[in-house]
Curated annotation (Swiss-Prot):
One GO MF term attached to the UniProt entry: monoatomic ion channel activity
Transmembrane keyword on record: yes
Lineage, highest ranks first: Bacteria, Pseudomonadati, Pseudomonadota, Gammaproteobacteria, Enterobacterales
Family designation: Belongs to the chloride channel (TC 2.A.49) family.
UniProt main location, coarse: membrane
NCBIfam families linked to this entry: PRK03655.1
Gene expressing this chain: yfeO
Organism encoding this protein: Escherichia coli (strain SMS-3-5 / SECEC)
Protein name: Putative ion-transport protein YfeO
Pfam families registered for this protein in UniProt: Voltage_CLC
Keywords: Cell membrane, Ion channel, Ion transport, Membrane, Transmembrane, Transmembrane helix, Transport
Location in or out of the cell: Cell membrane
Length: 418
């Protein structure tokens, strides 16, 4: 016979697995539709019209039209496509299900149109809202927080293709003063994360790792170098943190969301013309292209890092629906490659991983997630001790500093005031 603790853990196992699978399937469907639309907008359509897909005219036109289209969705859809991601954490309160269709459409348009945001925040919002709404009907005795945790864990597993990230994140959020052991509380979320990761793996494998030269033995000087790189990345990220609320307030002086997002899309188009197509989209595939292109110089990497960070701030401030983690990873990779080109004596594995750690820490203020992203992009077990040590001064630098989030005015409703 099972111990009562084991029976308690098994109680939510089936719902956890179902939520993990559903979270992954929603992500897969959204990404597939966005991929088809992206192929149409950036390959087939310009080819049919005889226009180069990387021409300045096409980049500006598509991003401007994308902004207008997203603005129309936010203006006229029920629930106004959910909350403004610039004002929300990654894992937030559930939104009304009526806002989800508009949110999904706005996300797909942004992903396909080349906006420099990832899918993580809207997908998380959709999955949490559905899990809470359906779970409350089927098992009303389970509280909303449990459904929120299961949905967020399943989504994290699906996004990163592994339950490890969920285990790291929830090991700190669920580690309260309760007498219930931590792993008892982690059991159901890890089931959801594992189900989400395995389901994603059946259809595609998220490819984060980069072909960067292997890092050998750690030396004391490497710790200092890594800490300096992380500090540089944090400094760059804090510039974006300073700019985001100010640009957000400036953009939201335009009361019409169609015009506001149209202007935002136009600015993104200008930035895309300056840095080229590799600076567009969420950044994961593009960072692979960036590493593979041996022709990039130090100034090219610097330009890509600056433009991508600026595009991230503009997209978030304009009200596009998307997450900030994936483009931040791109910024970290570009910054790390730039620093390696500038100081070749410091291995690229150190500069890239520590730059990712620093910039993701600024964006998420989550040490475990920052370590995870640095470790999966530059998969080298020798780097893990160095990253853990570099995390300490990086965390000190950010202690008490503002987050990359806009404080919503008290009089503003939960959704965009349109």
């Amino acid at each position: 016979m099972l111990h009562p603790r084991a029976r308690t853990m098994l109680l939510l196992s089936l719902p956890a697995v179902a939520i993990g699978i559903a979270s992954s399937l929603i992500l897969i469907v959204v990404m597939k539709i966005a991929s088809v639309l992206q192929n149409l907008l950036w390959l087939r359509l310009p080819g049919t019209l005889g226009i180069a897909q990387d021409s300045p005219f096409w980049i500006i036109a598509i991003l401007t039209l994308t902004g207008i289209a997203v603005g129309l969705v936010i203006r006229f859809s029920q629930g106004h496509a959910g909350p403004d991601p610039a004002c929300e954490p990654l894992i937030g309160a559930p939104v009304p299900p009526s806002a989800l269709p508009g949110l999904i459409v706005a996300l797909i348009l942004g992903l396909a149109g080349g906006v420099s945001l990832g899918p993580e925040h809207p997908i998380m919002t959709v999955n949490i809202a559905l899990a809470v709404a359906i779970g409350a009907r089927l098992l009303p005795r389970v509280n909303r927080m449990e459904w929120t945790i299961l949905a967020s864990a399943g989504t994290i597993g699906a996004l990163f293709g592994t339950p490890v990230a969920a285990a790291l994140i929830f090991s700190q959020t669920l580690n309260g003063s309760s007498e219930v052991p931590l792993w008892d509380r982690l059991f159901a979320p890890l089931m959801a994360a594992a189900a989400g990761a395995l389901t994603t793996g059946l259809f595609f494998h998220p490819h984060f790792s980069l072909p960067i030269a292997h890092y050998g033995q750690m030396e004391m000087t490497d710790i200092l170098s890594g800490a300096i790189v992380a500090a540089i990345a944090i400094a760059a990220g804090m510039v974006a943190v300073w700019c985001l609320p100010r640009l957000h307030a400036m953009m939201h002086q335009i009361k019409n969301p169609v015009l506001m997002l149209g202007v935002g899309g136009f600015i993104l188009g200008i930035l895309g013309v300056i840095a080229g197509p590799v600076s567009l989209f969420k950044g994961l595939d593009e960072m692979q292209q960036m590493v593979a292109n041996q022709a990039f110089s130090t100034s090219d990497y610097f330009l890509l890092a600056v433009i991508k960070l600026a595009a991230l701030v503009v997209a978030a401030a304009s009200g596009f629906r998307g997450g900030r983690i994936f483009p931040a990873v791109f910024v970290g990779v570009a910054l790390g490659l730039m620093l390696h080109e500038h100081v070749p004596a410091v291995p690229a594995a150190i500069t890239v991983s520590c730059a990712i750690l620093g910039i993701v820490l600024v964006v998420t203020r989550d040490g475990w997630l920052s370590l995870f992203m640095a470790a999966v992009v530059v998969p080298n077990t020798t780097l893990l001790p160095l990253l853990c040590i570099v995390m300490l001064p990086a965390w000190l630098l950010l202690a008490g500093k503002p987050m990359m989030m806009v404080n919503r005015p008290k009089q503003q409703p939960p959704h965009d005031n349109v």
